Amino acid sequence: MNLAVQDVVKRPLITEKAERAREASRQYAFEVHRDATKIQVKQAVEKLFNVHVLDVRTAIARGKNKRVGRNVGRRPNWKKAYVTLKEGDTIALFEGT
């Protein structure tokens, strides 16, 4: 599936776990398109943020069951990617500058 670079990376994930990974080992977390491959994620991050990506790990987060009154629904599944950058590269979006 051919995805545009802007469609692959949906948003950054800013959680406590992601912050610890960023500080300890230069890993940044993103929510990505469900059909995106590791190669597409790598190319998109390199092009969007002008950095060098060493490794990409992906995981499918399962949607949770939610209730509103007596109606039960389900949130959709989504994919996240942990991207490891080359020594010295940073993404300013996460640094707050």
From Swiss-Prot:
One of its GO terms (molecular function) is structural constituent of ribosome. The keyword Metal-binding does not apply. InterPro entries: Nucleotide-bd_a/b_plait_sf (IPR012677), Ribosomal_uL23-like (IPR013025), Ribosomal_uL23/eL15/eS24_sf (IPR012678), Ribosomal_uL23_CS (IPR001014). Keywords: Ribonucleoprotein, Ribosomal protein, RNA-binding, rRNA-binding. One of its GO terms (biological process) is translation. One of its GO terms (cellular component) is ribonucleoprotein complex. One of the early assembly proteins it binds 23S rRNA. One of the proteins that surrounds the polypeptide exit tunnel on the outside of the ribosome. Forms the main docking site for trigger factor binding to the ribosome. Belongs to the universal ribosomal protein uL23 family. This is Large ribosomal subunit protein uL23. It comes from Anaeromyxobacter dehalogenans (strain 2CP-C). The lineage of its organism: Bacteria, Pseudomonadati, Myxococcota, Myxococcia, Myxococcales.
